[in-house]
Amino acid sequence: MRGAGLRGIIWYVICTLFLLVGCSSVAQESAKEPPSFSERTQVVESPDLTFSRVDKLMEDMTLEEKIGQLLIVGMEGKTYGDELDHLIRQYHVGGIILLGKNISYPAGMLKLLNESKKANAAYKIPLFISVDEEGGRVSRLPSSMKKLPAAEFFGRTGDETLAYETGTYLADLLHAFGYNMNYAPVLDVHSNPKNPVIGDRSFSSDPDEVADLGMAVMKGMTDNGIISVVKHFPGHGDTHVDSHLSLPVIEKTIEELRETELIPFKRAIEENADVIMVAHIMFPELDHVFPSSLSTKIITDLLREEMHFEGVVITDDMTMGAIVNDYTVPEAAVQSFIAGSDLLLIAGDYENQVDTFNALMEAVQAGTITEERIDESVKRILRLKDRYMLNDDLIEEIDVTKIENKFNELLK
């Protein structure tokens, strides 16, 4: 893992903390403060130190700052503009996402990311800088750069070593631009050949193969400092409808889901996945009222309580047709948060982004959401940022030739 992070914060930990966790060697140094991000050189350290830093930071955060951290926002156009600047500087959003509509040439893409970081430089919490870089038809690279094949290619090889090396390559590629989070790999099982949205984005129709290859790609990224977001829980592989356009319905029982769709996600949880993205899909056998991304029965009862996931839950983009055909973005975001989500992904429309922030504030003021519930999610988010030592350091230039040499070596 690379970089400094959460700059400007002095983290205090009293001597008794070290005694309680039984770290006698640390106790001898108890007069010293725990290392800040910039001082740390090792990825692995006591979770108690991460928790202590986050707890200290949260003591000084306002409710507005906490709610800002719950949002990952997108933007219009290919250049940095006033709306994104306002969201970063005034609302202190947790992160940004770049989509295809934002991608230009390599230097332009780098400039956009650097300007986002500059806007956040005076703030104490670094941004998630996120992207969908799966390979195949879901790639956010400039058109001049070589792109990885779709997941289906790796499924045909069955080569877990190649899958891990692909995750490593993705980490190197994304670090080169300054990203720190990738919405990949896809853990959906390709169980419906007529699926209009997943298809070759899935590794296989075999859930165990999806799990094996997906975990290899995930670890290739996380071992090299990129946060991996596995998706689309509880499974998007058997849909007949594209959730970007309308709401898919899957008529499967929980027993049927356990036999296929949930297998890769169960493995991901066992392998300590950091973030799981929840899909916008209706599973009437599980919840006949809300789609999965808004469902307490699916996010809290199934994912959290039954499957014991303790990491960060993020929604799929809340501006997709599956949501906006039936809800406003703010009301859907509030319901998703009540259901158990931590991060709310709103990939576009400045008005919706600001209205969602205001709706969350109003929900707390009305008592619909407690501040304790806000703190729960913010702690998960900040611990993740802390663990990966995120930073807003600028990238001076991109060596495209070096990246392409790595690509050629990977797929030679």
Per-region residue spans from a language model:
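Hydrophobic faces of well-ordered beta-strands that scaffold small-molecule active sites
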Residues: 68-75, 94-98, 127-133, 181-185, ...
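Preference for extracellular/luminal or secreted protein segments
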Residues: 2, 6, 23-89, 306, ...
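Active-site-proximal loop/short-helix segments
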Residues: 141-146, 180-200, 231-247, 279
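Bacterial N-terminal signal peptides
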Residues: 12-22
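Second-shell residues forming the walls of enzyme active-site clefts
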Residues: 62, 104-121, 125, 137-139, ...
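Catalytic domains of carbohydrate-active enzymes, especially glycoside hydrolases
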Residues: 86-99, 169-181
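A substrate-binding/cap region within the structured catalytic cores of diverse enzymes
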Residues: 151-179, 186-214, 218
